[in-house]
Amino acid sequence: MRSILASLSALGTIIALAVSPAKAATAEPTSSAYQWLTLIDNQKYAESWAEGSVLFRVRVTEKSWESTTSIFREAVGHIVWRDVDSVSLVGELPNMPDGQYATVRYRSKFERKTDCIEIVNLTLENGLWRVASYTIK
């Protein structure tokens, strides 16, 4: 009986871990940016909005973010590859209040758009790097 209960308890833990939402914010900016982009790659637009910084969520509504991102990703298709091009830490970004920021630039290729630059600006919030803005060129 104990082994059955132990097995059920372990199974419950595994299930709970599997359904728990992934948190994009980490103590390392490159990891945070990549995890956040993975949410978008997996069409988890609402979750990517929720995982953004306060600055991000104030600047764009969840509905607008979901709509714009969905339309754009449908146009360019799925990500084929993405490589970190550069990472920089700065104290200010254009049109943002002074703070601690990181910019992670990626060279990316999508199904229908090649040779892209994705720029993820992150801000340090409570010791975690959260996305403040996202641009693709």
Residue ranges and their predicted role:
Residues 2-4, 8, 19-44:
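Short, low-complexity N-terminal intrinsically disordered segments enriched in polar/charged residues
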Residues 30-32, 46-99:
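Short solvent-exposed beta->alpha transition segments
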